[in-house]
């Protein structure tokens, strides 16, 4: 009997509190709730983990040892599961060979298409390389004018130097009486001596004929003789019209002019991961590394003696004596600014003197001088040589700082070799197709019509390609190109690519578990994504989505709201059922926001920008940006909006952040191309807060990441008992010998390998999971040892450490960003993306800032519930009110409507985007008809504009630097009391 429900009893994974529930099968189920409430614990660590585990356990023990078997979730009973597929937000691959085309398998079909119906051409002459049979050659010639006379030629020698007397002897011996030498006809006995040092072409005249039906047999035999003599090549020249182009034939894939040939086409030839198809220069990576003059000349505003090129200034005696000798030879001043030196001098310094010999003066250790004459190697060739010859990893790492990447000059970044680049389908080579945006590629294949047998073969392949491209368009990725590297995709894009691949697979009866597929997607594209999810469901699958998007929740067949709080305060089912059930439930926070009982308010007044305090970025042209001029008001909260692929990340992350980090923080990022930047001196620090994990090992935790663990260990080292025993702060670290338990090396758990079963982690039987040895655990602060403290939640720890400012400040900021429920020693690998980002935000908040920091956040609302977003906005507005500048890339309309300033990019994604449509207040953007963001924003803003009376926190003194307004301790206390007030209101 078919089951209609997935029945779960007694689920206790992570923070789930023994929950029982029945989920309908073959429906679209949305699981929502606060960040950290237990949504992923239920969807991924319970339902998916058990579905996957059961499927894998049905395989043989031999097969299981090659698969990663998931840990058995902590629950009493579960039934009604299907084989499970999870589509998570993790980025696809860090392999530089992985592209959108290879992930979606579209590239495999393209390789097949080009191998089966592609037409190879000669790279130099453009002639089609078509192998013809003798019958085809004869038929072609018999179709010519019967009154014309022709001669059949077999090329024996092609463009080779020499007298070739031996060749003529051999032809004479074989019975040939006429030859054509360099275009002139001769009797074989009357050929003049050939010039030894000149190139010659010698063709044997095989036959002379008029094309008539009765000579078909003779002509076939002549062609066979000619092909044998000419090694598969034949030319037929008109005798009556010598100026006419010859008819060229080949029995193999080769050019009739230059003998360029190809073996039979096969899919491997078009793979940049196979030696037969990859460009030999870059091994199929498409990029070449080179020492970049812009990176080598670090400070072009300085002179060579003052350090324009690091390591070649006065501080390095050996290299500077070379520069001094160069200056004497080329008559320039070593103290002159690099930018003012003549181009010829700069060329010689960087690339060497070429053939020019220069007199160099060397100082010996004894104080003497020697003079030697030789060519100057050049700084860049010097770096290349040292990089090539060194065996020291440290030297190699140091030199890597000066290396940049550029498209491979041999293949122009296409990754393929010469042969693969010159095979055509409908007059288009493969590299030309993979650079098209997906929607244009789809149009090309829909309109593709090949004649004859090629069309029949191509039909099936083209259908598969078209379907897969269509799925990418459906999930809002029409702006991507197939050659886009996988490691440049955002988490949301990577997830939607996997989603498109799954729809392409067309499986039925499967359970899909998705993690926020709407991330990085503009409201405009949301409808198409939701259509894709319903399509997956309609195929006959159960689709379980962890999602906060309002449209997705409203569309779902079944909604599950987990809460009421986060962490230890969550793990319960607050409400479940249809949308109406959620709206009516008094316990459901989600229902309160959806019904309008609670909402994120629009500010009563907006902060005005100060025209004298604007950051100007001019002429940004990275990726798809079209000479963009960006103005960001200092001291305000600015939202960067626009449809997916419009250029937001390129403009902010690749251009603005890298530029500011290099200038202000002294970093060495590669900056996307731009013309100039003004007013960066408004800021003294730039901070990028993204959603990457705060640590990749289980030893990393919120206490270590925020820097709280150091004062914590110092505090324990000051306890009288610890001082009496002579314990240092290092004694209380679980990462070094001394205080940690050596049986488990401070992990608290011991891994037991089970081969084809999942590895089992058991608590260490020496320390019982406490990570420290007995002596260390005897040291107590107010009755708690170091292990007890790491097991505390942030709110409990704050009560304990309130009198210790260095620890309390860090704990207060964790509370401010809504992370009061996480444990201090919780493994970083168990934090969600939203939690990791807020831990980073809290770390920055806990630092004493000057009110002149530029904060850049990329989609901070990822993984956040409406209620979490409200708390996050409180933090961002607090940063802004202290005089800092906050720039947020965001699609969430609740964040956008509360911003002071919006920069909207578009109008579309990919090559149809890359321009700023409108900049201004939310009201100004909402009034802009061409802006998609404006259209959705207009529905959320009241018709009465917010009163724009209050000036920005730093606009009072236009000529002064942004002032520091509030001390962090006061801010933290104010925020804490505000949090308590909201908590009282909520209850």
Curated annotation (Swiss-Prot):
Binding site for ATP: 33-40, 642-649
Residue span, ABC transporter domain: 312-589, 609-938
Keyword DNA damage belongs to the record: yes
Residue intervals of every C4-type zinc finger in the record: 255-282, 741-767
Disordered: annotated span: 948-987
Residue ranges of the TM segments: none
UniProt xrefs under InterPro entries: ABC_transporter-like_ATP-bd (IPR003439), ABC_transporter-like_CS (IPR017871), ATP_grasp_subdomain_1 (IPR013815), P-loop_NTPase (IPR027417), UvrA (IPR004602), UvrA_DNA-bd (IPR041552), UvrA_inter (IPR041102)
Chain intervals with Basic residues compositional bias: 978-987
Main location: cytoplasm
Basic and acidic residues composition bias: residue spans: 958-972
Top-rank lineage group of the source organism: Bacteria
GO MF assignments: ATP binding; ATP hydrolysis activity; DNA binding; excinuclease ABC activity; zinc ion binding
Keywords: ATP-binding, Cytoplasm, DNA damage, DNA excision, DNA repair, DNA-binding, Excision nuclease, Metal-binding, Nucleotide-binding, Repeat, SOS response, Zinc, Zinc-finger
One term under GO cellular component: cytoplasm
Function: The UvrABC repair system catalyzes the recognition and processing of DNA lesions. UvrA is an ATPase and a DNA-binding protein. A damage recognition complex composed of 2 UvrA and 2 UvrB subunits scans DNA for abnormalities. When the presence of a lesion has been verified by UvrB, the UvrA molecules dissociate.
Family according to the record: Belongs to the ABC transporter superfamily. UvrA family.
Protein name per UniProt: UvrABC system protein A
């Amino acid at each position: 009997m078919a089951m209609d429900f997935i029945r779960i009893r007694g689920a206790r994974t992570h923070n789930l509190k023994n929950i029982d529930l029945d989920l309908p099968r073959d429906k679209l189920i949305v699981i929502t709730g606060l960040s950290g409430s237990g949504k992923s614990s239920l969807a991924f660590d319970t339902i998916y983990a058990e579905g996957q585990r059961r499927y894998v356990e049905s395989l043989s023990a031999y097969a299981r040892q090659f698969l990663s078997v998931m840990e058995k979730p902590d629950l009493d009973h579960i039934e009604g599961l299907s084989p499970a597929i999870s589509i998570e937000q993790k980025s696809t691959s860090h392999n530089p060979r992985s592209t959108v085309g290879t992930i979606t398998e579209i590239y495999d079909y393209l390789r097949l298409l080009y191998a089966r119906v592609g037409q190879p051409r000669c790279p130099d002459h453009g002639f089609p390389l078509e192998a013809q049979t003798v019958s085809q050659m004869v038929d072609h010639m018999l179709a010519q004018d019967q009154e014309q006379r022709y001669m059949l030629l077999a090329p024996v020698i092609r463009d080779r130097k020499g007298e070739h007397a031996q060749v003529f002897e051999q032809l004479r011996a074989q019975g040939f009486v006429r030859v054509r030498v360099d275009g002139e006809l001769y009797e074989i006995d009357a050929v003049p001596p050939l010039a030894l040092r000149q190139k010659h072409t010698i063709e044997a005249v095989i036959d002379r004929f008029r094309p008539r039906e009765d000579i078909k047999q003779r002509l076939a035999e002549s062609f066979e003789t000619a092909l044998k003599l000419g090694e598969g090549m034949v030319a037929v020249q008109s005798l009556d019209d010598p100026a006419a182009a010859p008819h060229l034939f080949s029995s193999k894939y080769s050019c009739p002019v230059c003998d360029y040939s190809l073996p039979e086409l096969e899919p491997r030839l078009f793979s940049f991961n196979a030696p037969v198809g990859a460009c030999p220069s870059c091994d199929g990576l498409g990029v070449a590394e080179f020492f970049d003059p812009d990176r080598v000349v670090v400070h072009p505003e300085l002179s060579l003696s003052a350090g324009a090129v690091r390591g070649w200034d006065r501080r390095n005696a050996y290299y500077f004596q070379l520069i001094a000798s160069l200056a004497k030879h080329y008559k320039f001043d070593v103290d002159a600014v690099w930018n003012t030196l003549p181009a010829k001098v700069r060329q010689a310094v960087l690339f060497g003197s070429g053939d020019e010999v220069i007199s160099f003066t060397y100082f010996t250790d004894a104080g003497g001088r020697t003079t030697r004459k030789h060519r100057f190697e050049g700084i860049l060739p010097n770096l290349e040589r040292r990089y090539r010859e060194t065996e020291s990893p440290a030297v190699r790492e140091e030199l890597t700082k000066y290396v940049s990447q550029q498209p491979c000059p041999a293949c122009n970044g296409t990754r393929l070799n010469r042969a693969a680049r010159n095979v055509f389908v409908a007059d288009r080579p493969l590299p030309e197709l993979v650079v098209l945006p997906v929607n244009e590629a789809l149009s090309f294949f829909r309109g593709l019509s090949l004649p004859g047998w090629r069309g029949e073969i191509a039909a099936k392949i083209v259908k598969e390609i078209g379907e897969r491209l269509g799925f990418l368009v459906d999930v809002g990725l029409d702006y991507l190109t197939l050659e886009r590297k996988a490691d440049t995709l955002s988490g949301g894009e990577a997830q939607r690519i996997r989603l498109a691949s799954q729809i392409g697979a067309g499986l039925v009866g499967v359970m899909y578990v998705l993690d926020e597929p709407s991330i990085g997607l503009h409201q405009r594209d949301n409808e198409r994504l939701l259509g894709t999810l319903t399509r997956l469901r309609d195929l006959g699958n159960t689709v379980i989505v962890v999602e906060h998007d309002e449209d997705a929740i409203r569309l779902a067949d079944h909604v599950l709201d987990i809460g009421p709080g986060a962490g230890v305060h969550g793990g319960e089912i607050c409400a479940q059922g249809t949308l109406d059930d959620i709206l009516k439930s008094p316990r459901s926070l989600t229902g309160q926001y959806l019904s309008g009982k609670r909402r994120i308010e629009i500010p009563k007044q907006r902060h005005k920008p100060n025209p004298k305090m604007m950051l100007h970025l001019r002429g940004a042209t990275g990726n798809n940006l079209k000479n963009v001029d960006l103005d960001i008001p200092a001291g305000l909260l600015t939202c960067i909006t626009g449809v997916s692929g419009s250029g937001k990340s390129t403009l902010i992350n690749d251009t603005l952040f890298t530029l500011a980090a290099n200038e202000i923080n002294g970093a060495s990022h590669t900056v996307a191309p731009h013309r100039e930047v003004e007013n960066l001196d408004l800021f003294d620090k730039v901070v990028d807060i993204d959603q990457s994990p705060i640590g990749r090992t289980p030893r990393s935790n919120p206490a270590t990441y925020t820097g709280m663990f150091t004062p914590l260990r110092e505090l324990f080292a000051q306890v009288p008992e610890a001082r009496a025993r002579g314990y240092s702060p290092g004694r209380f670290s679980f990462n070094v010998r001394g205080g940690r338990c050596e049986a488990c090396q401070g992990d608290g758990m011991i891994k037991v390998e089970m081969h084809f079963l999942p590895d089992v982690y058991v608590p260490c039987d020496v320390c019982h999971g406490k990570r420290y040895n007995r002596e260390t655990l005897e040291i107590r602060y107010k009755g708690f040892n170091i292990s007890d403290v790491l097991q505390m939640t942030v709110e409990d720890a704050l009560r304990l450490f309130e009198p210790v400012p260095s620890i309390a400040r860090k704990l207060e900021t964790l509370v401010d960003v809504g992370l009061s429920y996480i444990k201090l020693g919780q493994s970083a690998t168990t934090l969600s993306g939203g939690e990791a980002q807020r831990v980073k935000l809290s770390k920055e908040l806990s630092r004493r800032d000057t009110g002149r920091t530029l904060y850049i956040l990329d989609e901070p609302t990822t993984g956040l519930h409406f209620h979490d977003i409200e708390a996050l906005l409180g933090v961002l507005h607090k940063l802004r009110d202290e005089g800092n500048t906050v720039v947020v890339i965001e699609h969430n309309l609740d964040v956008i409507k509360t911003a002071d300033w919006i920069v909207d990019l578009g109008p579309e994604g990919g090559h149809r985007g890359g321009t700023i449509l409108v900049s201004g207040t939310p009201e100004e953007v909402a009034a802009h008809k061409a802006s998609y963001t404006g259209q959705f924003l207009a529905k959320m803003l009241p018709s009465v504009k917010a009163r724009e009376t209050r000036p920005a926190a730093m606009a009072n003194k236009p000529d002064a630097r942004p002032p520091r307004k509030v001390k962090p301790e006061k801010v933290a206390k104010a925020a804490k009391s505000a949090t308590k007030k909201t908590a009282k209101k909520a209850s």
